[in-house]
């Protein structure tokens, strides 16, 4: 294979060779400038916490800005990443309290033990971990491997920049499979994971940051303020009556869904699960059945947001609330207790297949 050579430039008049830093003479072309030449240099140290002990450290909003982050060999530390990132790896950490803002890709815990965490991500995985307690928002099914004593709860957190960080990370606040754990290495007769108590207090696990710098982030762990709706997930339902409500894409879809959640939970009903997903006409036929023709034209606007509520009288309560609060807005709501369970199954079976593609 040959080599490419360029001719050596002749010395300028007067015997001086032209320096590389001089401007090109008239008529000569400038060397092309590429975007990657002008990109700011990334210092890995700015995106790494390594070898720390008994420290409180973190990154403020805007300081990570979608980069990869590494946490390793930390002991008895409180770590707060108040920003979105691409991926996060956490290796060989012991007795740490960790908050991780929205992660566009995966978070991977390896060989960690006795850590308490709050995490939002696209993919969650652990390997060779023991006794992790995690308040989780995960868009796909979380996976544990060779890990024991794992406990999970629903992500519950707020600070003013968090909603935009979820958007920047490409995560929907309605897609959270926090309790649907897949154990890659199950042991016969044992259960390597379980759920945190339903009344678990987030700050008892991951306290608010104590350092003056990190206190500037206005954090709340109040369930009513949480960016992620608090769902029951796979906890046992209190009633055999559920109801499906589906909002269609529009300017106020998220706000309307949050409003219905507030109204229904305020009346004592429980939010079991939520989902945001795109639908086609044939999907609507299967899910909405005889009502499909009414909703198919709305599917072109974008993804739908579905909510499952549970509790005695959930269908009547949801229909009355939608009529009172969202009059004039097209919303699918189960028609009766008899049809509601099938509505829920039809939608979430479709959604699980769609998300798995």
From Swiss-Prot:
Cited InterPro entries: C-CAP_CF_C-like, CAP/MinC_C, CAP_C_sf, CARP_motif, NDK-like_dom_sf, Tubulin-bd_cofactor_C_dom, XRP2
C-CAP/cofactor C-like domain: residues covered: 32-186
Post-translational modification (record): Myristoylated on Gly-2; which may be required for membrane targeting. Palmitoylated on Cys-3; which may be required for plasma membrane targeting.
Composition skew (Basic residues), residue ranges: 1-11
Organism encoding this protein: Gallus gallus
Subcellular localization, as worded in the UniProt entry: Cell membrane
Major site of localization recorded for this protein: membrane
Origin superkingdom: Eukaryota
Identification of the protein by name: Protein XRP2
């Amino acid at each position: 294979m040959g080599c490419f050579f360029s001719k050596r430039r002749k010395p300028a008049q007067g015997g001086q060779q032209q320096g590389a830093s001089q401007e090109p003479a008239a008529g000569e072309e400038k060397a092309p400038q590429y975007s990657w030449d002008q990109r700011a240099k990334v210092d890995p140290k700015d995106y790494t916490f390594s070898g720390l002990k008994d420290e409180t450290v973190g990154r403020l909003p805007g300081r990570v800005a979608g980069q990869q982050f590494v946490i390793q060999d930390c002991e008895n530390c409180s770590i707060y990443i108040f920003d979105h990132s691409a991926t996060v790896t956490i290796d060989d950490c012991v007795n740490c309290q960790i908050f991780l803002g929205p992660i566009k890709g995966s978070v991977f815990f390896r060989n960690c033990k006795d850590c308490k965490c709050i995490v939002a991500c696209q993919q969650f995985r652990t390997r060779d971990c023991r006794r992790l307690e995690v308040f989780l928002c995960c868009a796909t099914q979380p996976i544990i491997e060779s890990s024991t004593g794992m406990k999970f709860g629903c992500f519950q957190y707020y600070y003013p920049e968090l909603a935009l960080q979820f958007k920047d990370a490409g995560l929907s606040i309605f897609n959270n499979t926090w309790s649907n754990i897949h154990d890659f290495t199950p042991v016969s007769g044992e259960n390597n994971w379980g759920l945190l108590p339903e009344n678990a207090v987030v700050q008892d696990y991951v306290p608010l940051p104590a350092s003056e710098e990190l206190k500037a982030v206005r954090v709340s762990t109040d369930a009513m303020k949480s960016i992620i709706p608090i769902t029951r997930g796979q906890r046992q339902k209190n009633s055999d009556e559920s109801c499906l409500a589906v909002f269609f894409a529009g300017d106020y879809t998220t706000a309307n869904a949050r409003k219905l959640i507030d109204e229904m939970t305020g009346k004592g009903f429980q939010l079991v699960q939520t989902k945001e997903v795109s639908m086609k006409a044939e999907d609507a036929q299967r899910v909405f059945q005889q009502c499909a023709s009414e909703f198919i034209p709305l599917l072109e606007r974008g993804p739908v947001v579905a909510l499952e509520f549970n509790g005695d009288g959930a269908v009547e309560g949801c229909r009355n609330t939608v009529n009172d609060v969202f009059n004039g807005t097209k919303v699918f709501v189960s028609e009766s207790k008899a049809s509601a369970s099938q509505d829920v199954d039809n939608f979430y079976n479709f959604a699980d297949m769609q998300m798995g593609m």
